[in-house]
Amino acid sequence: MVRIALDPTPYNNTVHLLDFPDLVARLGYEYLQLTPNPDFGRHFHYPKVDSDMIAKLKKRAKHAGVTITSVLPVQRFGGPEEHHVQAAIFNTTRYIQIAAELGAPVVNTEFSGRPEREEESEFAFYRAMEALIPVLEREGVQLNFDPHPDDFVEDGLEAWRIIRGLNTDQVGFVYVGSHTFHLGDRASTLLPEIGDRLGAVYTADTFDHHRSNGLRYITNPPGNAVRVHQHLNIGDGDVNWTELFGTLKRTGYLDRDDALIVSNVFAEDENADESSRFQLAKIKELIAAA
């Protein structure tokens, strides 16, 4: 059974962390992914929840009929500086413990690091994982990585190779729809290769920045080392959702009990309720049609 979760980022400034379960239930969702939030933990920082808040959050989720599936911290696993690596290990160790305490044994995250220092960043990543894999095994938590635009690895296939090199089933891959055109736009060949190591799929649309001879987006001065993508409602961009969900069906992902699809639209804060409800209906439609 596919679990469809909401990323509540659009509500960070208006809804308290403890109210997120009631929010997602009101929007029709049964599942929630916890993402960077002032009360939960900000990008690159140590988490700010204690056991008392975790207990309250679990109680609120149970009362709302909502399951917390996963947590999403962003840490500098790819360094490349030594203090970045040490902070990532220290902070993520606590996030892993929190995930276990929440009964949400999945941590989804990003590689980070710097693309212009790819070799150093990859080494930093492997060193961080050497320290964290024993923690994952001890706590019974899965860690999945998204090659985010401007990380040290952005291409989907190369990211999978890096994950595969860890030689552990405790670490998997996050396929992010809004990163399609940075990943290489190759879902139909990439996802079969990843196979059972696909840990989560995020659904938001984006435009293909390669179109119009690369002039669809213009930054000045020309040649800036920038990355452009969006997190739009499904159908508002260029992602081939029929192909993506067809591939997810063909590879067996949609038939897995632990399948997780997360709606993560960030471009519609002023229409967040309508967007969230639309996304839920559209994801169900795509699953049914696959």
Ranges and model annotations:
Residues 11, 259-274:
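A short, acidic, flexible beta-alpha connecting loop/helix-capping segment that sits on the rim
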Residues 33-58, 112-117:
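Glycine-rich, proline-tolerant flexible connector loops at the mouths of alpha/beta enzymes
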Residues 272-290:
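C-terminal helical cap(s) of enzyme catalytic domains, especially alpha/beta-barrels
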Residues 24, 32, 61, 99, ...:
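Conserved, mostly hydrophobic/aromatic
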Residues 10-12, 36-38, 74-77, 111-115, ...:
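Active-site-proximal loop/turn and secondary-structure-junction residues that shape catalytic pockets
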Residues 2-9, 32, 130-232, 238, ...:
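Acidic/histidine-rich catalytic cores of soluble enzymes
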Residues 21-26, 48-69, 93-103, 130-138, ...:
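Acidic (Asp/Glu)-rich catalytic clusters
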